[in-house]
UniProtKB/Swiss-Prot annotation:
GO molecular function list: enzyme activator activity; phosphatidylinositol-3,4,5-trisphosphate binding; phosphatidylinositol-3,4-bisphosphate binding; phospholipid binding; protein kinase regulator activity
Protein name: Protein CRAC
PANTHER family assigned: PROTEIN CRAC, TANDEM PH DOMAIN CONTAINING PROTEIN
One GO-annotated biological process of the protein: MAPK cascade
Compositionally biased spans, kind Low complexity: 601-626
Disruption phenotype: dagA and piaA double mutants require both proteins for reconstitution and activation of adenylyl cyclase.
Cross-referenced InterPro entries: PH-like_dom_sf (IPR011993), PH_domain (IPR001849), PI-Interact_SigTrans_Reg (IPR051707)
PH domain boundaries: 22-122
PROSITE patterns the record matches: PH_DOMAIN
């Protein structure tokens, strides 16, 4: 009897330091000693298939770390029916060699210990120790399971359609391996002789929070919920998929996307049947109606792929009618630009010389810079350098050694306008050197000020602000309107038939260098300072007019739609062949929507491929979008007749500054509309903080 409960090798294994982190329950109770010694305090610990009892020192509540137990009770040799309470605060543990009598200190601890003890004995009764084998056999089996269910088990949280079937197959293998390993591991972990070293390490991981079962559950939840989200989203939006999609590439993308959704449905049901555990009931297959709908739309779009031709701009006009040797058609545009002059926009110019204290003050109104230039001419001064506070863009040739730099700073919030200039009569420091300070209070907070020449905002003909502020009459100035100036606009654009490119040639203004710069050159440079950076070229490729930094315009002969990858805002027109007109379709923004609402639908290729190309593509779109509110501009309709494009004046719509776009030869009417809308596109981009300088700074 003493031999069976005090084997030296086991006592060494049960040093308190080795088992204290692996104890199910522990308590100080009194054990009946042999040879009539009565009840003695012992520290009882329930450790896997053993009860260990330690001798305590005086006033000690726990054994020392290096202390071996006084003895142990192998629960695999105990009878659960005879292990029971025999008297108040007293119970017995029935072992095949001996009955242990234990007295608890309180009723609660006794019942808790006895409940755990009996449950452990009954669980151990079900284990066939011979089937498990020896320690070497157990270690070999654990290593085989570890080859499949590796530690750590890395599983994806997103699975692309191309990998969906492979993922389901892999999860089936994981589940099959887990179903074999789980009962074996649960038996091994109850046997203290087996559960040590690398076996214990693997078992602890297997049943822990990072183990295979919980890892597979987390993977299942994220992957399947992502599939369900895409299936439901596609089902709700499928009727709108052909809106603004008219090209072969569009229909190909839609067909591929719908096939991917049917793959998701098949793989989802396959997973639910073979990998989910149910109580004798197979799950009902889901999304069968959606799958049938997807198949019907696939059959609808596949013929369109075959019938669509590769879109070329040549199909929209007769190329043979262009007789120009270089294939370039010059397009003339004309109109009137109106400028507001506000009471607050008054400049005081003070000129002070270094040799005398003479002060000259000139007053002119802004933003009419010509008055300022005439004032400067009276003082025989020239503007040498011009810097904008935002762009820091130099707009002049390098100054000569006899010129001092002019400093120009615009701070829109404080409305300060400061300029310092120098004299062109500087002779070795002996002549008078006047310094000029200009202070101006004018409003630069409106994006239209930054997008219009000469620091001015256009005067709306009706009640709509050009950038969509929705305010009319007063413009963007800080004070009341005192005058409205008008300036004729005459610009030229070119259409290159060979490259299908629309472009605006560089302005000849501002190319004269030196001190004899004209008023027009200075104002032109100032205009470029505020509007510069836009690439004034549109190239038609694969159904789109594409610009370097102004977005793209889809055109298929019927629908004209401008979009930009960093905003959901769009400008849409539809061609009405009966009226020979382009009719504007007002943009409908969601309530509270901002520019970052979604990826533009015209970017259909990117949008659909985001769910088909790779595993990471099923995650949320990484495309950065602007968070500014959308413009509310109501754009005019345009009529096309005899190669002329003119706006149709409608009450409530904005009246454009370009009132005539004239082509001497027949070219695609969409080219003329693109020219007419370029300024509006620039205004919208600046309003959305997507102007070229903003983008380049980011």
């Amino acid at each position: 009897m003493g031999k069976t409960e005090r084997k030296k090798e086991l006592l060494e294994l049960f040093e308190y330091e080795k088992i204290k982190g692996d104890v199910s329950y522990s308590s100080i109770m009194k054990k009946a000693g042999g040879n009539g010694k009565g009840f003695l305090d012992r520290y009882f610990a329930l450790h896997r298939n053993y009860i260990l009892y330690y001798k305590l020192g005086k006033s000690s509540l726990k054994p020392d770390d290096k202390q071996e137990p006084q003895g142990y009770i192998n629960l695999m040799d105990c009878n659960p029916d005879d292990t029971k309470e025999i008297a108040p605060l007293m119970f017995q543990i029935s072992h095949k060699h001996r009955t242990y009598i234990v007295k608890a200190k309180d009723e609660s601890s006794m019942k808790q210990f006895l409940t755990l003890l009996i449950a452990r004995i009954r669980s151990l009764e079900k284990i066939d120790i011979d089937k498990l084998g020896c320690t070497v056999v157990v270690l070999t089996k654990v290593k085989k399971f570890r080859e499949v269910l590796t530690n750590p088990l890395i599983l994806p949280d997103r699975v692309s359609p191309e990998m969906a079937e492979e993922w389901v197959k892999q999860m089936k293998n994981y589940n099959a391996s887990f179903n074999l390993a789980d009962p074996f591991i649960k038996q091994v972990e109850q046997i203290s002789e087996f559960c040590r070293g690398e076996v214990k390490e693997y078992i602890d991981w297997f049943g822990g929070p990072e183990g295979p079962r919980l890892a597979m559950i987390r993977c299942e939840e994220t992957v399947l919920s992502n599939w369900v989200e895409y299936i439901n989203k596609t089902s709700s939006e499928i009727t709108t998929y052909q809106d603004n999609r008219f090209f072969r590439e569009d229909f190909k993308d839609i067909a591929v996307h719908l096939k991917n959704m049917t793959t998701f449905i098949d793989c989802y049901n396959d997973y639910m049947i073979h990998c989910r555990k149910y109580n004798n009931n197979k799950p009902n297959t889901k999304f069968l109606e959606e799958k049938q709908t997807f198949k019907e739309y696939i059959e609808k779009f596949i013929p369109k792929v075959a019938s669509c031709n590769d879109v070329s701009l040549n199909q929209f006009y007769d190329r043979s009618l262009i007789q120009s040797s270089d294939g370039i058609v010059t397009i003339n545009t004309s109109g009137i630009k109106k400028t507001l002059i506000n009471q607050s926009n008054i400049i005081s110019i003070t000129s002070t010389t270094t040799t005398t204290t003479t002060t000259t003050t000139t007053t002119c109104s802004m933003p009419n810079m010509s008055n300022l230039i005439h004032s400067l001419d009276h003082t025989n001064l020239n503007i040498i350098d011009l810097n904008h506070s935002k762009s820091q863009q130099q707009l002049h040739p390098p100054p000569s050694p006899h010129h001092q730099h002019l400093h120009h700073q615009i701070v829109s919030n404080s409305k300060d306008f400061n300029i310092s200039v120098s004299s062109n009569n500087f002779n070795d420091g002996n002549s008078e050197f006047p310094n000029l300070d200009i202070n101006c209070d004018f409003d630069l907070t409106s994006a239209s000020n930054l997008s219009s020449p000469i620091l001015s905002s256009e005067v709306p003909s009706n009640v709509v602000d050009p950038i969509g502020s929705g305010q009319g009459g007063g413009g963007s100035g800080g004070g009341g309107v005192t005058a409205v100036t008008e300036e004729a606009i005459n610009e030229k654009w070119h259409f290159d038939c060979n490259t299908s490119m629309i472009f605006k040639p560089p302005s000849e203004d501002g190319r004269n260098e030196g001190s004899n710069m004209s008023t027009s050159s200075i104002t032109s440079k100032m205009s470029l300072s505020l509007n510069g950076g836009f690439d004034m070229k549109w190239v038609y490729q694969c159904g789109y007019f594409k610009s370097k930094n102004m977005g793209s315009i889809s055109w298929n002969g019927k629908h004209w739609c401008w979009s930009h990858p960093r905003t959901s805002y769009k400008i849409k027109y539809i061609w009405d062949p009966t009226k020979q007109s382009f009719l504007n379709i007002p943009f409908k923004s969601r309530v509270g929507a901002t520019g970052g609402g979604s990826v533009p639908s015209s970017q259909s290729t990117n949008n659909l491929q985001s769910s088909t190309s790779s595993m990471s593509s099923l995650s949320s779109s990484s495309t950065s979008t602007t968070k500014r509110s959308h413009p509310t501009t109501l754009y005019p309709d345009y009529q096309f007749k005899d190669n002329l494009l003119t706006p149709i004046i409608i009450e409530g719509r904005h009246q454009p500054s370009l009132t005539l776009i004239d082509s001497p030869l027949t070219i695609p009417n969409a080219c003329l509309l693109t020219i007419a809308m370029t300024q509006y596109i620039q205004d919208a981009l600046i309003h959305l903080s997507l102007g070229p300088k903003v983008l380049s700074s980011k």
